[in-house]
Amino acid sequence: MSQESSYGKWTISSSDDSEDEKPKPVKPSTSSGPQAGQGVSKEPTYTCSEARKAAHKRQISPVKFNNTDSVLPHKKQKMDSPEGLGWCLSSSDDEQQPDVTQQEQPKGVPPQEKKYAPSANVTTAQKVEDRSPPDSHRAQRADEEYETSGEGQDIWDMLDKENPFQFYLTRVSGIKAKYNSKALHIKDILSPLFGTLVSSAQFNYCFDVNWLIKQYPPEFRKKPILLVHGDKREAKADLHAQAKPYANISLCQAKLDIAFGTHHTKMMLLLYEEGLRVVIHTSNLIREDWHQKTQGIWLSPLYPRIYQGNHTSGESSTHFKADLTSYLMAYNAPPLQEWIDIIQEHDLSETNVYLIGSTPGRFQGSHKDNWGHFRLRKLLQAHAPSAPRGECWPVVGQFSSIGSLGPDESKWLCSEFKESLLAVREEGRTPGRSAVPLHLIYPSVENVRTSLEGYPAGGSLPYGIQTAEKQRWLHPYFHKWSAETSGRSNAMPHIKTYMRPSPDFSKLAWFLVTSANLSKAAWGALEKNGAQLMIRSYELGVLFLPSAFGLDTFKVKQKFFSSSSEPMASFPVPYDLPPELYGSKDRPWIWNIPYVKAPDTHGNMWVPS
C-alpha cells in the first residue's frame, strides 16, 4: 500500500494501526536462482509479523551499504550528522526528510544489492563481520554453540536461595562470557537437570516447531507437547503442517473473537516426575528470539505434588494458584482442562510473585479488576508502598512495540493507564497524576543500527509509520535502550518491563516483567464511560512486590550479574538507570521505512520491502 503524508510517500508493507504484532499467513517462497544463503527460504517457515518477515529477508539477502550517492535521490538536501540517522518525526521544517523512497526506485526493480566497499567511516568490526561466513552458516554455528549451552555454569547454583526473585535473562551470543554466566538458554530450561519431563505445554505467539523440538533433550523429544496458539485460517493450517510429523504434538487454538487481538502470552508448563514448574517469559519459540536479544524469564520453584491425606490447598500468599487456574479457564478450551487438573494436584505455596494476565473480552463490574491494567491497579492498591511524603516516584515502561494510543496523551496513556501504574496502598499521600514523570524506554534508530544483529533487529520492534505519524506527541517520552549493567546494550530488547523507582533510581516500589507491550490491545481500554474494560489479546506477566518478600521496597542491584556481596533483596533490573532521554537527533525505530545513510554492524542498509 502506498501512503503519502507530510513526510513523503512510502510503500507500506502492513498496517500497524491497531496492534503491534498481527499474525500473517506464511506462504512458501517461490524465488529461484542463486541467493545469498541459497537453500534458505526468503520468508520464515513460521507465522510472524510483516516486520519479522522483512528482517528475515534482509538477513538472507542483505542490501550492502555504499557511501556514494548512487542510492540516494538526486535532490539538494541538508545533510545531518550521523546522530540524525533515521526517520524524522518532528514537525520542524528544517529537519531532514528521509533519503530514499520506494517511489524513486525504477518501477519493478528492487534496490540493488551492492557489493560492500569499506569506507573510512566503517569500523574494523564491520569489516571483520563482512568477511565472516554467510548468515545461514552463522546460524548453524550458533545453534551448535548452544548444544552445550549450560556447560560451565552450575544450574543448581542459579536456582538456589541466593536468587529469591528467580528472574533471569536469556543467553546472548556475541557478548562477554561473564554476562551469560547466570543467564539461561531454552535448552537449559528444558534440561534434565530441571526435572525428568513427563509432558509440557508451550503457550506462545510464534512457533518454529522443528527448532523447538531440537531444544528438548533427545530423551524428552517424544514426550507429549501441547502448543497453545492464536493462529487462524492459513496460519493455523501452516502450524498444523509444521506439527504433523510429530505424533506427540497436539495443538490448542486460543479464541480471539475481538479484531486485531493476538495470543501473545509466553509460558511453559513443565510436568516432571518430581513435580511441576511454571515458566513465564518474553521469547517467541523461534531461534532468533533466543540468540541476540534481551529477553526475560521467571522460573517458578519446583512445585511438589500434593499427596492424599495432605490437607493443604497448595495456595500461596499471592494467590498464584487460583489466578493461574482462572487464566487457563478463560481460554474455555478442553485441552487445557488436563493442565488445570495438574495444577490443582500440586503445591504452589512457595510462589512469591503475583500473576497479571490479559484475556480477550469486555469486562464490567468486579470482572474489570481481573485482567489488564485494572488487574495491576488492584494489586498495587492492595500491596504497593506509598512514596515518602514529599517524594515523587516516577514510573518506567520498557517495551518492544507500540500500538495506536490515540490523538493525545489524555486519551489513554496519561489517563487510565498511568492511573493504574500510580496506584498505591494509601491514596491520600500521592502527588497528582500529571506531576509524576513517565519514562518510556524504546530503542532508537541508532540503538538498532549498532546492535549485534544490525538493522534486522528492528524486525522485532514492529512500530509502524502509520501509527507513529499519528502520535508524535508520544515521542518526547522516549528514552534510549542502554544495558551496560547486564552487558546487553547491543542486544535489542524483546523483554517488556514496567516499574516504579525512587526519584534517585536506587529503590523500587514494584517491578513487572510481562509479554504486554505498550498497547490498548494488550492492557485494555475503558469503554461506556469507564464502565467496561475491553481487551483484545492474551498476555501474561509476573509482578514482584516488596511485601511478598517481607520488605518495604526493593534496593536496585548495581550490576545485574554481580556477586552475592550485594544484599539478597537487591532487585536485578536488566537495563541502566536512570534512563537516558533521546537526544535531539535520536528517532524511534520504525520498521517499515528505509535507513540508508549509514551501515549497520554487518555493513548493510535497511530496505524493508
Curated annotation (Swiss-Prot):
Gene Ontology BP term (one): double-strand break repair
Disordered as annotated region, ranges: 1-154
Cellular localisation: Nucleus; Cytoplasm
Primary residence: nucleus
Role of this protein: DNA repair enzyme that can remove a variety of covalent adducts from DNA through hydrolysis of a 3'-phosphodiester bond, giving rise to DNA with a free 3' phosphate. Catalyzes the hydrolysis of dead-end complexes between DNA and the topoisomerase I active site tyrosine residue. Hydrolyzes 3'-phosphoglycolates on protruding 3' ends on DNA double-strand breaks due to DNA damage by radiation and free radicals. Acts on blunt-ended double-strand DNA breaks and on single-stranded DNA.
Quaternary structure, from the entry: Monomer.
Protein name stated in the entry: Tyrosyl-DNA phosphodiesterase 1
